[in-house]
From Swiss-Prot:
Species whose genome carries this gene: Methylobacterium nodulans (strain LMG 21967 / CNCM I-2342 / ORS 2060)
Gene transcribed to yield this protein: purA
Protein's name according to its UniProt entry: Adenylosuccinate synthetase
One GO MF term attached to the UniProt entry: magnesium ion binding
GO annotation, cellular component aspect: cytoplasm
EC top class named in words: ligase
Enzyme Commission identifier(s): 6.3.4.4
Length: 430
């Protein structure tokens, strides 16, 4: 029996929600280990759609403990709202079903304001964030001035920490021409929300270590995609946290040996939200067709996603940087009916063929995709639950992806419904 880490292997929006829900039904504990409420998950269970952005997917499953790890930045006001919204759908969340790391960093209103200012002040410098304060909160964490969950329990210490925090932020805001933050007002806001957050606070690293030693199945739920990783992604058009599988250990307080099986979620084509390089992007009618069929709009922002052909070079890179053992291939049905389909196998840069996306921002913008073209299929793959139900050419496409990325398919998803899944290998049984 293995613990399982789920990571997006592209730029996010790969369909992790459905796969995580399928795995969460088998897990005892589901852990979020990075990011914040900037990445949405959509779950469809018995005809009901649940949209999550901060809470682990396990919250909609009775009998499963959900954990927000220390690697997550937590907006306490959003957390309260998300819990209330799920409550209206019949999902009850209590301290018995949800734990939050007491050493997790808080997102404050000043973080959201700074994020929004940076994204709107100069269009040429825009990264394409969700403007929800994620990046500025991580900056304060690394700068050793962050307010953490545990600080809400000590009013005197909280006041001192706010003073230290504002010594930095108000100097910055003066330089930017933004109104300064009143420390007393911020303290009042935090003390008001504290009673709704502190009951969930716990020493998460100890809780998870106990669960591991007891042989409980732990599912580590990644948000976004590894190509947005602050180190291994398309920098600077990335998020502000590490997303690769190794972060599951750091962001939860467990050792690397606790990770177990790494499952990469891979869409059968490629999408991206926001700015940044996208070698296989299709700006023509084909790209529009893929986007319309795949309903490619962000869960959190509603932004239209950019669409393109499958990029095997990028996914192969992620397989290596995350140590992916197997993949879950999603949205194969969106490619039904295409006469031909292209797969990017590498790039052309200055007359040379390279097999990975270079680190240089300038080179990333200049690479040209090298494609191979395969025949498509006209039969439907939607709703298939066995290999026998798939068209031969669709199987050929899947097998070619496996060859090019160096990882095998463990699960194949053919619709948003959780049961429309072809299981090849259960990651928990590795």
């Amino acid at each position: 029996m293995a613990n399982v880490v789920v990571v997006g292997a592209q730029w996010g929006d790969e369909g992790k929600g459905k796969i995580v829900d399928w795995l969460a039904e088998q897990a005892d504990v589901v852990v979020r280990f990075q990011g914040g409420h900037n990445a949405g998950h959509t779950l469809v269970i018995d005809g009901t759609t649940y949209k999550l952005s901060l809470l682990p997917s396990g919250v909609v499953r009775g009998g499963t403990l959900s954990v927000i790890g220390n690697g997550v930045v937590v907006d306490p006001w959003h957390l309260v709202d998300e819990i209330a919204r799920l409550g209206q759908q019949g999902v009850t969340i209590t301290p018995e079903t949800l734990r939050i790391a007491d050493n997790a960093t808080l997102i404050l209103p000043l973080h959201r304001e700074l994020d929004h200012f940076r994204e709107t002040a100069n269009a040429t410098l825009r990264i394409g964030t969700t403007k929800r304060g994620i990046g500025p909160a991580y900056e304060d964490k690394v700068g050793r001035r962050a307010i953490r969950v545990v600080d809400l329990a000590d009013a005197d210490l909280l006041g001192a920490k706010i003073e230290r925090l504002l010594a930095h932020h108000n100097a910055l805001r003066r330089g930017l021409g933004i109104e300064e933050v009143d420390g007393a007002a911020l303290k009042t806001e935090l003390l008001a929300i504290a009673p709704r957050i502190l009951p969930f606070a716990d020493t998460v690293w100890a809780l998870l270590d106990e669960a591991r030693r007891a042989g409980r199945r732990i599912l580590f739920e990644g948000a976004q995609g590894a190509l947005l990783d602050v180190d291994h992604g398309t920098y600077p058009y990335v998020t502000s946290s590490n997303i690769v599988a190794a972060q599951a250990a750091t962001g939860s307080g467990l050792g690397p040996s606790a990770i177990g099986y790494v499952l990469g979620i891979v869409k059968a084509y490629t999408t991206r939200v926001g700015e940044g390089p996208f070698p296989t992007e299709l700006t023509d009618a084909i790209g529009e067709k893929i986007g319309e069929r795949g309903r490619e709009f962000g869960v959190v922002t509603g932004r239209k996603r950019r669409c393109g052909w499958f990029d095997a070079a990028l996914v192969r890179q992620t397989v290596r940087t995350s140590g992916i053992d197997g993949i879950a291939l999603t949205k194969l049905d969106i490619l039904d009916g295409f006469e031909t389909i292209k797969i990017c196998t590498g790039y052309r840069l200055d007359g040379r063929i390279i097999d990975h996306l270079p680190a240089s921002q300038a080179d990333q913008a200049r690479v040209e995709p090298v494609y191979e073209t395969i025949d498509g299929w006209f039969e439907t793959t939607a709703g298939a639950r066995s290999w026998a139900e798939l068209p031969a050419q669709a199987i050929k496409y899947v097998r070619r992806i496996e060859e090019l990325i160096g990882a095998t398919v463990a699960l194949l998803s053919t619709s948003p419904e959780r049961d429309d899944t072809i299981l090849v290998h259960n990651p928990f049984e590795d």
